[in-house]
Amino acid sequence: MVALFHKLGPDAPTLCEGWTTRDLAVHLWVRENRPDAAAGVFVKALSGHLEKESRKVAERDFDELVDDWGRGPATYNPVRFVDAQQNFVEHFVHHEDIRRANGMGPRDFSARIKQQMHSYLKLLAKVALRNSTRPVIMQPEGLPRIVAADKHGVADKGDAVVRVSGEVGELILWSFGRDAAEVALEGDAKAAVRSTL
């Protein structure tokens, strides 16, 4: 993603509504290097702190900011200990946010990466789709299906479900509200309430 940031520069569009590549780079840097400020995403009382720190970081030279973020969290930063697990999906989604907004299509991944994506999707789909009004059955190509929002076992008993199929990476994007995801959808799409990342 670092190379793509550098290639496109700070003013390229992203799929994150209203955000440019600079805004996304600032978000990623703050999230990984200033967890005290990043908490403002979830804790309303800290949102002012997040905005202040984000404005300060946004003033940095874009290429230096991207390179700094690309090196990962500082050694003493507690985020470093959960970096791979915490960032795998977020970095994938945000990388695609940049790619898709700039005319690039889906990428091909190895079987190992697809399996890793599937493992994360199994965990995250339950959270990302928890507000759905019908069960959501996701069928990643070549991998076991994933059922989310099946509050009453309906997915096993009936057909009042939403079915989504496609490559596992596309299902991750779709689960997190990215309409650019290349998936096939059957059923009431409005019943599948997706999260954002």
Task: Place the predicted regions along the sequence by residue.
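Soluble acyl-CoA-dependent acyltransferase catalytic core bearing the H(X)4D motif
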Residues: 2-5, 53-57
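Short, contiguous, pocket-lining structural segments
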Residues: 16-20, 57, 83-86, 163
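Structured surface interface patches that mediate subunit assembly and partner/cofactor docking
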Residues: 7-11, 34-49, 64-197
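An N-terminal domain-cap segment
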Residues: 1-31, 35-40
